[in-house]
Structures are given as C-alpha cells and as structure tokens.
Swiss-Prot record:
Dependence of activity on temperature: Thermostable. Retains full activity on incubation for 10 minutes at 65 degrees Celsius, but loses about 75% of the activity at 75 degrees Celsius.
Protein name, per record: Leucine dehydrogenase
Catalysed transformations (reactions): L-leucine + NAD(+) + H2O = 4-methyl-2-oxopentanoate + NH4(+) + NADH + H(+)
One of the GO biological process terms: L-leucine catabolic process
Pathway linked to the protein: Amino-acid degradation; L-leucine degradation; 4-methyl-2-oxopentanoate from L-leucine (dehydrogenase route): step 1/1
C-alpha cells in the first residue's frame, strides 16, 4: 500500500503513529478532513494481522466518520483511532494513559470515543490525560446510554422513508420486520409499537426476541427466515453486510431502514435495491443519533438539545431522496453527495481569515 498516494486520492490530512514500549501501545490515529471542525471518531482495539491492515482500517473508518458527521449536520470532521492488540488480554492502564497523551498532543484536532474493543472505563482512563474524549462515565458529564437516542433517530428516519415509499409517514398498521433486538432495536420497537405498527422480530439471542414478543406483541421468526417475511419495512438492526446478492432476491418489503452499520455488502447492492423498487434509508444517515448525542457532550450535554437535533434525521433522510431524484442516483450515493456538498460549502465559507475561529471545542469560551 502506497500510503501517501492513498491519502492524496481521498484527501486525508494526517496519519499519526503512536507507540509506547512500556505499555505495549501500538496505535494509529487517522484525521481525514477537518473542514467542518475537529475530527470525531471512535477508538477501536483489534487483533489486526498486520500493521498495514490496521492502517487501512484506520483510513477507511476515519473517512466514513467524515461522511457520517457531515451528513448528520455536525460541525465535526472525521477521524479514527485503531489499537493493535487483543482487547481481552492486552489492555492496561498505562496503554490508555499514553494514548491519551498522544491525543492531547494533537491539541483538539481529534476527539476520541468508545468503539469496538474499547469501553467506557477505557475512555475514563483516557480522560485522565486529555479532555478530547467523549462517551466517558456519567460522573464526568457524559450523556449515559446512547441507545434510546439512537433508536429515536432511526424511528424518525424510518418515518421519512415511509413517506417516500407510501406517500404518508404514518407507521400505524405497517408491518415492520426487525432483525436483531439489541439495546437500540428494543427502543425502536417501543416507538413502533406505540404508533401501532405490527412487529415481526428475530434475534440469535432468543431472550431478546422473547422480550419483544411479550412486551410488544411481536411475532417471532427464525433468524434465517426474516428475509422471507411479507412486510412493509425491513429494519436491519444487527450485523452489517446483510443486504447482498442472496438476501435482496428474498426481500418482500418496500423500505429498508434500520440501525445496523454497513448494511450493504457492496455498493452495487444499493443500486439493486433501487432496481427492485425498494426505498433504502442509508445506514450512516439514519443511525446518526448516537454520534449526534455524543457530540452534544462537547457543548456540555443537554438531552433536550440533543433530541431536537436527532429529530432532524427525518429531514436529512428526505433530503437524501431529494438529491437522489435530482441527480438520478441511488440513495446510498445521494447520502455521500449530501455530505460532500456540505463540506464543500463550508470550505468556501471558511476561506475568510479569522484570528480566533469558533468551533465546538471552544464554543462555550467565545
């Protein structure tokens, strides 16, 4: 991999290699684009097979956060940290203290958060060394469990997708097939049940599914059968890459809208959904409630303000469909274009020099 060629192709700003011999830290911090503001993205710890694989993951995930933050309407760029190591046995306090100091050394260009392989407790240790971290324990001023907020955003986005598909955003009487009933999906089911939707659920953990059956009157189907049920809306809320060559042929819905990340196995599957007449709410737009919620911590967390911002996911999804029609492209590409247009607009707006420019990390001091 020619790193500088790759960074130039996709407009990356910075790649920081961090090591600490005493703690065993080997980490990579990626900063993609900071046109909108400081880069925000989680910290992932994984048993990468090689350093190159870790670098590629940091670059891919960092760029993804640029699009997610921009599409969510946040004044934040995109970034990511990856740590090479086994989260089950390689963690220690010194490792996260050292990494916190590296992040502090970036002086606010990058803000970290919890991700795969890291925990709230790890973020608390990072917080000992830097203020450029979100998702810490509530005792340090965090927002707490983000699942209800994320779920509300998915619910609002689903209503927007229903409006596009059916001409009306009401979910009353609609049949919604929910794949996975974890923390976010459970809260989503609550909203859907309260509006009068009929729920069909599945989960590899039968206890999760049984809870939805008991509390919301949902119908249970085996995990392998969820793609075959007759429904109005299919809500993927578990693993990624579940929209693929095999499953698209089986889907019997008019809308795909759920909380799972990376729902399309390949980009071409977004085009295949369109060709089948299925309205697709792009995953990183509809599930942005979590990042919106955690970003609000940078202002001094206010639940009412965060929920109002999350409510706007409805309009973001409608705008995606508007761009798709305007440009004659599938909705997954329209989401990218919406993010890119916002970044380009702000790049032009911010071309004027300011000695002391306001941004999210100094907002309350200006």
């Amino acid at each position: 991999m020619k790193i500088f060629d790759y960074m130039e192709k996709y407009d990356y700003e910075q790649l920081v290699m961090c090591q600490d011999k005493e703690s065993g830290l080997k980490a990579i911090i990626c900063i993609h684009v900071t046109t909108l503001g400081p880069a925000l993205g989680g910290m992932r710890m994984w048993t990468y097979a090689s350093e190159e694989e870790a670098i590629e993951d940091a670059l891919r995930l960092g760029r993804g956060m640029t699009y997610k933050n921009a599409a969510a309407g946040l004044n934040l760029g995109g970034g990511k940290t990856v740590i090479i190591g086994d989260p089950r046995k390689d963690k220690n306090e010194a490792m996260f203290r050292a990494l916190g100091r590296f992040i502090q050394g970036l002086n606010g260009r990058y803000i970290t958060a919890e991700d795969v392989g890291t925990t709230v407790e790890d973020m608390d240790i990072i917080h000992e060394e830097t203020r450029y971290v979100t998702g810490v324990s509530p005792a340090f001023g965090s927002s707490g469990n983000p699942s209800p907020v994320t779920a509300y955003g998915v619910y609002r986005g689903m209503k927007a997708a229903a409006k596009e598909a059916f001409g009306d955003d009401s979910l009353e009487g609609k049949v919604v097939a929910v794949q996975g009933v974890g923390h976010v999906a459970y809260e989503l089911c609550k909203h859907l049940h309260n509006e009068g939707a009929k729920l069909i659920v599945t989960d590899i953990n039968k206890e999760n599914a049984d809870r939805a059956v008991q509390e919301f009157g949902a119908e249970f189907v085996h995990p392998d059968k969820i793609y075959d049920v007759e429904c109005d809306i299919f809500a993927p809320c578990a693993l990624g890459a579940i929209i693929n060559d095999e499953t698209i042929e089986r889907l019997k819905c008019k809308v795909v809208a759920g909380s799972a990340n990376n729902q399309l196995k390949e980009e071409r599957h977004g085009k295949m959904l369109e060709e089948k007449g299925i309205v697709y709410a792009p995953d990183y737009v509809i599930n942005a409630g979590g990042v919106i919620n955690v970003a609000d911590e940078l202002l001094g967390y206010n639940r009412e303000r965060a929920m109002k911002k999350v409510e706007g996911i409805y309009d973001k999804i409608l705008k995606v469909f508007e761009i798709a029609k305007r440009d004659g492209i599938p909705s997954y590409l329209a989401a990218d274009r919406m993010a890119e247009e916002r970044i380009e607009m702000m790049r032009k707006t911010r071309s004027t020099f300011l000695q002391d420019q306001r941004n999210l990390i100094n907002f309350n001091n200006k």
